[in-house]
């Protein structure tokens, strides 16, 4: 076989520019800086649009003894009201494990947990109607901190341990032993564009969902699951987001599911734009961590052994906490070398909102 010459081998092949030294703009850069970029709330609203608000738990943990929504249904502008019993499919909207309920049923597990949802002709009237609900609770003991969860062995997932060498021997034989604890607080994502979803019923009985979501495929899957329809009957669209940072990875699906359920029930377009004050209490944040360590060191400051306890405040469900606490454990040695170590990672279950993804897991 004849060998190709250099000219022949390169014929028809375009050279690839490295990009170094070139001005490579974002595909929507001009739209962003001129204000022409359309976010979900900028889309022209259909004339029959309904708006959503939710009625929320006012206690951290308890059983719902009675729920009277008669006044809510009769309130001005209200078109529809739903509870978990109105969900035709599966009300569990968990991203990985189970327990993340679309709406509370017999028990509430954190302050702000949605119990029912209202669709009205304006967001103001929907919010006003929610205040008319009459709810009676039976208070139950609440676990609110990592320390309380550790004491009561309350966990969303089993504890994991990374072990290397004989930690006890290494620490006891060290010249110095250092012990301390550190409480790393959580953090709100505070994206500029809030949580929002627009659901449009389609002519074939399905729904077209436009949402501000980092995971539009999960939105499609969970909306179909909640509605009890085939996945091809749900079109999920995300053009852009005004920030996410992990806060719209698993959290955005709830809004899409509620808006879609109202859209299918009423054959009308529905927008669920969560007020910022609701976002602050209803959606997950960065995990708090309560960390303790005991380390053996030499006179030269060299670490010879470490016992470390990392307790992540996961909230009421697992959500994405498995990987988040794992990541904290993976990074526990930082830039140091531990000849002997035991790292324990606790996924603490508390009666607080279920914490979620945030840039820089763990």
Where are these regions (language model features)?
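Beta-strand segments within the central parallel beta-sheet cores of soluble alpha/beta enzyme folds
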Residues: 83-84, 233-239, 267-277, 304-309, ...
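Flexible, low-hydrophobicity surface segments
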Residues: 1-158, 162, 177-180
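Glycine-rich and small/hydrophobic secondary-structure elements
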Residues: 99-126, 246-299, 356-362
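Solvent-exposed alpha-helices and their adjacent loops that cap or buttress functional pockets
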Residues: 25, 43-48, 101-102, 107-112, ...
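Helix-loop-helix junctions that connect adjacent transmembrane helices in secondary transporters/permeases
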Residues: 147-227
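Alpha-helical support elements that line or immediately flank enzyme active sites
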Residues: 54-82, 116-136, 197-266, 323-333, ...
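Glycine-rich loop/linker segments at domain edges
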Residues: 22, 28-35, 160-197, 288-362
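Acidic, glycine-rich active-site loops and adjacent beta-strand->loop/helix elements
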Residues: 87, 213-216, 240-244, 274-284, ...
């Amino acid at each position: 076989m004849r060998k190709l010459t250099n000219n022949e081998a390169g014929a028809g092949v375009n050279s690839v520019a490295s990009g170094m030294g070139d001005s490579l703009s974002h595909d929507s850069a001009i739209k962003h800086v001129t204000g022409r970029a359309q976010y979900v709330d900028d889309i022209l609203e259909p004339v029959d649009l309904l708006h959503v608000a939710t009625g929320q738990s006012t206690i951290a943990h308890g059983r719902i003894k009675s729920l009277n929504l008669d006044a809510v249904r009769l309130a001005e502008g209200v078109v529809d009201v739903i509870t978990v019993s109105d969900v035709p499919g599966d009300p569990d909207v968990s991203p990985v494990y189970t327990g993340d309920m679309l709406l509370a049923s017999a028990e509430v597990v954190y302050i702000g947990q949605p119990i029912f949802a209202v669709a009205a002709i304006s967001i103001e009237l929907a919010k006003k109607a929610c205040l008319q609900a009459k709810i009676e609770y039976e208070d139950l003991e609440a676990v609110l901190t990592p320390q309380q969860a550790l004491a009561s062995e309350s966990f969303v997932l089993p504890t994991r341990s990374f072990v290397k060498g004989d930690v006890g021997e290494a620490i006891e034989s060290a010249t110095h032993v250092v012990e301390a604890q550190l409480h790393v607080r959580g953090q709100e994502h505070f994206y500029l564009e809030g949580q929002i979803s627009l659901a449009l019923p389609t002519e074939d009985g399905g729904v077209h969902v436009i949402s501000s979501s980092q995971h539009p495929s999960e939105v499609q899957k969970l909306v179909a699951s909640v509605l009890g329809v085939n996945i091809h009957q749900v079109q999920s669209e995300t053009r852009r987001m005004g920030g996410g940072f992990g806060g719209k990875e698993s959290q955005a699906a709830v809004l899409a599911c509620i808006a879609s359920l109202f859209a299918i029930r009423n054959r009308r377009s529905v927008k669920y734009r969560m007020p910022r004050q609701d976002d602050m209490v209803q959606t997950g944040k960065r995990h708090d961590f309560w960390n303790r360590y005991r380390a053996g060191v030499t006179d030269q400051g060299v670490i010879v052994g470490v016992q470390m306890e990392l307790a992540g405040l996961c909230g009421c469900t697992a959500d994405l906490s498995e990987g988040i606490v794992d990541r904290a454990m993976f990074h526990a040695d930082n830039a140091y070398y531990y000849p002997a170590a035991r790292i324990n990672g606790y996924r603490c279950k508390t009666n607080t909102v279920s914490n979620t993804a945030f840039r820089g897991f763990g």
